[in-house]
Amino acid sequence: MGKLFGTDGIRGFANIYPMTVEVALKTGRAVARFAKEHGGTVVIIGRDTRRSGDMLEAALAAGISSMGINVLEAGVIPTPGVAFLTATVKGAGAGVVISASHNPFHDNGIKVFKSGGLKLTDPEEAKIESYIFDAGPDRADSSICEPKTSDSAIEPGTISTISNASAQYANFLTSCYQRDLDKNTPDQPLKIVVDCSNGASFKVAPMVFPTLGFETQFIFDTPDGKNINHNCGSQHTETLAKRVISTGADLGLAFDGDADRLIAIDEQGVKLTGDKILAICANHAKAQGRLTNNLVITTVMSNIGLSKALERLGIDHIKTGVGDREVLKEMWATGAVMGGEDSGHMIFSEFHSTGDGILSALCLIRVMVDTNKSLSDLATIMTVYPQVLMNVEVDPSRPDFMKIETIAREIKRVEQALNSSGRVLVRYSGTQPLLRVMVEGPDLEATKSHCQSICDAIKQASI
């Protein structure tokens, strides 16, 4: 069997392997076994708005129940909402999210949180995967539901609904914003436009922003099972930017399908990605004495402008591999309370154990409220360097390209040309036979030329 778990759980086209009801059923049994081994009696399930979510939820719940573990269904709720419930519901040994994040509606995925609302480690993920394909006496396949005698049958767990799951999560979010709130609340409430991406935030977001006194307009908040992420959300902010300008709003907020990432729009319609939001929030936390160890965790894909901004602000930073799980791992190791990716995944561990789009939005808004500054003013903290990314198809065997003299020489030439004013990152794709070439520099045309020259060297080497 091929490996099921990718960089963020199991993912694929719904109703095609591995995103089938058969795999979902076996995954439910495997997760139940994992939860039971860690003293859990309950597994939480949440999902986004994709049409296939109901189907996969039913299979997962059946698998979990068949192993004698109770199921609590949270319904449509953001991924970080499942993490929150997994950390707070008594007896919860795991939480399962059915979502494919920012992907089109025809895709879906399954990702797992362990008790405490934490993402699985690589060994824990491997253990669950081994349970899915286990051939032992407790294997997670259909035979476990076919006991030879009634004495050997497992008593099924119950399957029930958490009727107020969204409200519980919304109350948690509002409490995070209101913590230590002082007299700086503006006389006029901020005017906000929120793009729910027709996804998992469409129920929770209206319970949060108006409750906190913001004049809020919601767009793309009418999911139909097929319109999630369609020309909306964190990857398609054009409509949001136009609405912010036309309504005179102070800012716009765009979430992805499962609302674990945030992209912001300032009052002039300019987009702020994760790097710039992280710089704004880190600087404010430092000023308030809340930036533990004076440290922020970023990734190798973070813009060089973020590194330069943090250095200028006197804030230390460590770069990790790509993925919010890598960021969180380094945060735990170093005691950092803030980290994230330019894609909009940001972790504020002072409040939550995972990336959370709505929480990130509230942290950004708190900076605006506390400083009484516009978002465009705050955004001047960081200059985003032009970044060019190109892909080159290569052999699936993934040879060590730095051992090929012509490629190594060209990369070194570009690095020397950029000096400290830019950088080069060449890495293999995690899912496709591609070499990704990323070059950053102060001049866009020169950066394009540098990136193309490296790609040409790779193509000529025929790797």
Curated annotation (Swiss-Prot):
GO CC terms: cytosol
Q: What is this protein called?
A: Phosphoglucosamine mutase
EC number(s) per UniProt? Answer: 5.4.2.10
Kindly list the positions at which Phosphoserine occurs in this protein. Answer: S101
User: For binding Mg(2+), which residues are annotated in this chain's numbering?
Assistant: S101, D256, D258, D260
Q: What does this protein do?
A: Catalyzes the conversion of glucosamine-6-phosphate to glucosamine-1-phosphate.
Q: Which residues form the active site?
A: S101 (phosphoserine intermediate)
Record keyword Magnesium present: yes
Please state the span of the N-terminal signal peptide per the UniProt entry: none
Q: How is the cofactor bound?
A: Binds 1 Mg(2+) ion per subunit.
Keyword annotations for this protein?
A: Isomerase, Magnesium, Metal-binding, Phosphoprotein
Family affiliation: Belongs to the phosphohexose mutase family.
InterPro entries in the record: A-D-PHexomutase_a/b/a-I, A-D-PHexomutase_a/b/a-I/II/III, A-D-PHexomutase_a/b/a-II, A-D-PHexomutase_a/b/a-III, A-D-PHexomutase_C, A-D-PHexomutase_C_sf, A-D-PHexomutase_CS, Alpha-D-phosphohexomutase_SF
